[in-house]
Amino acid sequence: MSTIPTTRSGLVVWFTGLSGAGKTTLARALATLLQEAGYPVEQLDGDVVREHLSKGLGFSREDRDTNIRRIGFVANLLAKHGVIVLVSAISPYRETRAEVLAAAPRKLEVFVEAPLDVLIQRDVKGLYAKALRGEIAQFTGISDPYEPPLHPDVHLRTDLMSLPECLDHLLAALERLDIVVKVSHQ
């Protein structure tokens, strides 16, 4: 079931969490639902943006902040033009996330979480194993800090909730903001 968009007002939906928590999976699934319902949607994935817009940046705190600020600039620009922007980026530092989201016309901060043992099991690239062996320096959640949101708009435990359950929570949050009306994934 889908309906016509309620508004042309844009929004930044910022998915934050550790690698493997499900940020990109959720953003892709939500984008599909919203696009099928006629909403203007763009996805900004942290890995893709880092490869193209932030090529050459490392993983120091300064470089990570620069990367997040770049993503935020693009996201906020699109949102100001009526686009629902779905950002999936680890974005480990609270202060930088808050700074970027403060500039958004409207925002929804989504904390995507799963326990470390689950993230390690999900890790098909073996990045966590390498980080735990010390082969990857500055790996968020292992040798570099991740500061979870203190008061996210939506908190999704992907180890306890299915993808459809997570989508239900996200759609309900978008409905509360009067961004969408009754978009269904069933």
Swiss-Prot record:
Highest classification ranks of the organism: Bacteria, Bacillati, Chloroflexota, Chloroflexia, Chloroflexales
CDD domains in the record: APSK
Record Gene3D superfamilies: P-loop containing nucleotide triphosphate hydrolases
An annotated Gene Ontology molecular function: ATP binding
Record-listed ATP binding positions: 17-24
Transmembrane portions of the chain: none
Function: Catalyzes the synthesis of activated sulfate.
Catalytic reaction equation(s): adenosine 5'-phosphosulfate + ATP = 3'-phosphoadenylyl sulfate + ADP + H(+)
GO cellular component: cytoplasm
Gene name of the encoded protein: cysC
UniProt-listed InterPro entries: APS_kinase, P-loop_NTPase, Sulf_AdTrans/APS_kinase
Active-site residues, as the UniProt record annotates them: 91
UniProt EC number: 2.7.1.25
Pfam family, one: APS_kinase
Protein name, entry field: Adenylyl-sulfate kinase
Protein species of origin: Chloroflexus aurantiacus (strain ATCC 29364 / DSM 637 / Y-400-fl)
Pathway, per record: Sulfur metabolism; hydrogen sulfide biosynthesis; sulfite from sulfate: step 2/3
